[in-house]
Amino acid sequence: MHAVEEEERHEVDFLSRQVEDISDVNGSNVRIKEILSNQIVNQNDSFGKLYEITSSLDKYEPSEVLFYAAEVLAKLMDSQDVAIYTVANHSYARLFSATSPKARMLGNSIHYVQMEELYEKLREKKVFINKTMDERYPLMADAIYSEDEMQLILMVWGIPWERMTLGQANMLTVIGYLIQNAVVRANRYLSALEQQRYIHGTRILEADAFASLVNAYLNAREKKLTECALVVFEEGEISREEAAGVLSGMMRQSDYLGELSDGKMYALLANTSAEDAGMVVERFRSAGFPCRMKEEMEL
């Protein structure tokens, strides 16, 4: 009798565990169903709004478009951590805008061809998905091409694993195309005004164009989308045109020389912290160009 009771007790325990296992599986299935359902709903909702939201870039000045493209990308990917890099050549890319310290973790300049797993996908014009959660890479990335030349790299962090899907990758691709359209329009506009924007025979931006550019950077800095610094030059012994020729060779492609309404020449240092700007100022001075940081950057 005791043996029968013991056997029945074991059977009850076994069946109880089976019920618990089934409950766990059902719970997981419900969770998966919720994730997939939310993903579908969110994707449909986002696709319906994609054009409307990316079209908001058209309201900005051409020099502002890439800054706010980062905000648009963050909103549509539902992430607080996105970055946009501009490709400087066939090896390096420069950070243009980022929405958080996390999105700046790779630094102001990346040797993207050495980021092998990421570069392999981008070179194939595919979205990179960081399936191994390798901390050296963003969670997702896509490249924007123009005439088979890589122009921009979009990077996204801060998304949960359940959204690192092919559907989300397709969405990032569409967002990239729409951002590209806005950027191409802005660049065409700026190219059309090229001769009007620079002081004749120099690479010095005239006052209105330079003021617009500085304001774009200041507004983006206020929203923590970028860092920047403004350096003002004192009149030296050589002409401004000669000085601009030498200084341009000491500056990055992403930096600008220009005049403001006070008639002085300035350098706008993009994505540059105050500490780094201090080193640039010392380099300019050592080359014979007296200058200083403009502490109050309001125009």
Give the label of every model feature segment.
Residues 153-163, 269-271:
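Short beta-strand-to-loop transition segments that serve as allosteric relay/switch motifs
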Residues 210-235:
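Active-site-proximal structural segments of metal-dependent nucleotidyl cyclase/transferase enzymes
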Residues 45, 55-69, 202-210:
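Signal-transducing coiled-coil linker helices
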Residues 53-59, 68-124:
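Structured interaction and signal-relay segments at domain junctions
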Residues 163-184, 190:
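Amphipathic alpha-helical "output/dimerization" segments
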Residues 237, 244-276:
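Conserved helix-loop-beta segment at the catalytic/binding core of cyclic-nucleotide signaling proteins
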Residues 134-143:
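A short beta-strand signature within small-molecule sensing/ligand-binding domains used
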Residues 6-56, 185, 190-192:
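Signal-transmission linkers at sensory-effector interfaces
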